[in-house]
């Protein structure tokens, strides 16, 4: 410590750094040291021998500082050096740490005018307060207080002083003094019970009964008021029991909201469900909600001194109440979904049963397995009689112009009719002049034929395509196949797929595979029915030529009949009539030529 101060003084005075010389005496197991210091050409010697070299050097530096501080111009400089180094503040802190005490606390007071303030500092250590000389700065006042504290601590009765000391007690080293002061402070702390006088005073004041009236919080005022009334009403009840019961009553009332309610705009008109009313019961004694006022449109206003919020009070607004419980909504959604599923799964047969006639061309797989016997679907006798009468009338002497007009009328009325005709004898497959506009689909796809009368309306979404072919003359060598009637064919969505095959060449036939399911749901992406009319020009026929009946014509799509043998006589009669008409027309042509 003193060595550092002497070195700083030399640096400020622009002197050379001090140099130390040591003298050793005594045996090796107990050596003694004496040091001398050279400061600015002057030599200062330690007053006595010391046990260590470091202590001897510090003693020599202390003697040099004391001598220099007493001299003329250098005295002020030495005093400043000793003051500015803050050595005493460090001494106090180290001593308190060794003694196991709290660190020293400095309190500075400012006084005097503003342009020339004066600071006075006091330091507290081990329950003792020391006041230093005033200073111009706060730092200077703290250093003065530390110097005053250290000087007073050194004057205390020493405890634990070493019995054998090589140095006299008047010239103890600073480290030795620090150890002695630390022991003294520790012994004083033990005698005081480890508590400072201020702590003892605080403890005594806390143990004293307070003469002031206790200030209770506002929220508990009702509790103590009720307790006072309870004492007057029941003087025989012990105060502890009365306090216990009153505390429970206050807790029960505090759990309910005591907030004044203010109506909000846009309050709903429906009554709250019982679950919400159970969660938010009305307050007692402070607010009574009229029956005409909506309870959900009221929100709480928080007063300044409000009690503790209840536990169930959530951050969500109380005005939000669901109209119906959640299970009811889920049940209704299920019902809607089930109704939609029933509407989707409804087959077209039930929807179009009013407009479609029963199918004659349906064949079942079971009939094919049993010796290839085919069955007709049941049809009404009225439709069979109508088809037979229409076949008979068409096989009569009807001119091609009249037949063409009737076909046009049928198409204008918007009815799509499939005329059930008896299959005639098949011509040889090698006839190149016969044209069969066959509508094909892949194997296993469904073909659907439906006939609609003229008066019946047609469903807009029914996937039907009407293929109308005007009568065209065929080679005169085949009198049985003169013209092709108008046929309305309803194709399912599978037939419109891009994988559909191309129509076969002329003169070829292709059987139609009809599965057991005749009706099929139309996808929503299909358009309405389209009518396609194809006309083949007549080259060799004249207007007055009588064409054969439509009943003997080969249909565009061949339908396998279940009983072909029963209709053979009628087909033969139609063939003979057609051949007679053909020969008559050829003779008339020759006569005209």
From Swiss-Prot:
Keywords assigned by UniProt? Repeat, RNA-binding
- A GO term for molecular function: double-stranded RNA binding
Q: Which CDD domains match?
A: DSRM_AtDRB-like_rpt1, DSRM_AtDRB-like_rpt2
What sequence ranges are listed for the domain DRBM? 1-70, 87-155
Q: Where is the composition biased (Low complexity)?
A: 205-219, 572-586
| InterPro entries (alphabetical) | AtDRB-like_DSRM_1 (IPR044450), AtDRB-like_DSRM_2 (IPR044451), dsRBD_dom (IPR014720)
Bias regions of kind Polar residues — which residues? 188-197, 378-408
- Region annotated Disordered sits at 188-221, 357-408, 546-593
The record's listing under Gene3D superfamilies reads: 3.30.160.20
Tell me the function of this protein. Binds double-stranded RNA.
PANTHER family, per the entry = DOUBLE-STRANDED RNA-BINDING PROTEIN 2, PTHR46031
User: What name has this protein been given in UniProt?
Assistant: Double-stranded RNA-binding protein 2
Q: Which organism is it from?
A: Oryza sativa subsp. japonica (Rice)
Report which gene this protein is encoded by: DRB2
């Amino acid at each position: 410590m003193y060595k550092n101060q002497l070195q700083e003084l030399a640096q400020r005075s622009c002197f050379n750094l001090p140099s130390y010389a040591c003298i050793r005496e005594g045996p090796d197991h107990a050596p003694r040291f004496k040091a001398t210091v050279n400061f600015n050409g002057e030599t200062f010697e330690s007053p006595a021998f010391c046990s260590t070299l470091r202590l001897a050097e510090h003693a020599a530096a202390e003697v040099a500082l004391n001598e220099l501080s007493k001299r003329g111009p250098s005295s002020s400089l030495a005093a400043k050096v000793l003051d500015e180094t803050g050595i005493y503040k460090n001494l106090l802190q180290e001593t308190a740490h060794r003694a196991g005490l709290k660190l020293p606390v400095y309190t500075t007071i400012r006084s005097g005018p503003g342009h020339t303030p004066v600071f006075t500092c006091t330091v507290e250590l081990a329950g003792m307060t020391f006041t230093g000389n005033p200073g111009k700065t706060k730092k200077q006042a703290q250093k003065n207080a530390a110097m005053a504290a250290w000087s007073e601590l050194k004057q205390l009765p020493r405890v634990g002083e070493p019995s054998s000391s090589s140095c006299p007690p008047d010239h103890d080293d600073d480290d030795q003094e620090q150890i002695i002061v630390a022991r003294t402070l520790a012994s004083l702390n033990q005698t005081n019970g480890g508590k400072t006088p201020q702590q003892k005073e605080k403890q005594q004041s806390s143990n004293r009964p307070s003469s002031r009236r206790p200030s209770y919080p506002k929220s508990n005022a009702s509790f103590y008021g009720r307790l006072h009334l309870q004492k007057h009403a029941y003087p025989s009840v012990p105060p502890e029991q009365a306090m216990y019961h009153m505390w429970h009553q206050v807790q029960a009332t505090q759990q309910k909201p005591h907030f004044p309610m203010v109506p909000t705009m846009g309050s709903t008109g429906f009554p709250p469900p019982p679950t919400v009313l159970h969660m938010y019961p009305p307050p007692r004694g402070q607010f009574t909600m009229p029956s005409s006022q909506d309870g959900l449109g009221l929100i709480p206003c928080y007063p300044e001194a409000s009690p503790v919020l209840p536990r169930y009070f959530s951050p969500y607004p109380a005005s939000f109440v669901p109209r119906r419980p959640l299970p009811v909504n889920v049940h209704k959604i299920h019902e809607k979904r089930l109704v939609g599923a029933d509407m989707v799964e409804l087959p077209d047969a039930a929807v179009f049963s009013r407009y479609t006639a029963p199918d004659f061309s349906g064949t079942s797989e079971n009939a094919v397995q049993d010796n290839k016997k085919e069955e007709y679907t049941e049809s009404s006798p009225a439709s069979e009689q109508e088809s037979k009468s229409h076949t008979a009338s068409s096989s009569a002497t009807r001119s091609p112009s009249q037949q063409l007009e009737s076909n046009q009328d049928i198409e204008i009325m918007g009815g799509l009719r499939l005329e059930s005709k008896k299959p005639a004898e098949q011509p040889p497959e090698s006839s190149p002049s016969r044209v069969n506009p066959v509508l094909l689909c892949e194997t296993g796809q469904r073909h659907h034929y439906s006939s609609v009368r003229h008066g019946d309306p047609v469903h807009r979404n029914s996937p039907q395509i009407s293929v109308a072919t005007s009568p065209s003359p065929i080679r005169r060598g085949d009198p049985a196949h003169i013209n092709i009637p108008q046929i309305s064919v309803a194709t399912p969505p599978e037939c419109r797929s891009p994988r559909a095959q191309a129509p076969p060449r002329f003169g070829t036939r292709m059987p139609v595979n009809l599965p057991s399911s005749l009706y099929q749901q139309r996808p929503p992406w299909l358009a309405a029915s389209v009518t396609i009319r194809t006309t083949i020009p007549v080259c060799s026929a004249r207007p007055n030529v009588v064409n054969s009946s439509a009943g003997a014509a080969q249909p565009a799509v061949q339908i396998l009949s279940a009983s072909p043998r029963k209709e053979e006589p009628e087909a033969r009669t139609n063939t003979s009539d057609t051949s007679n008409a053909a020969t008559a027309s050829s003779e008339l042509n020759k006569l005209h030529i």
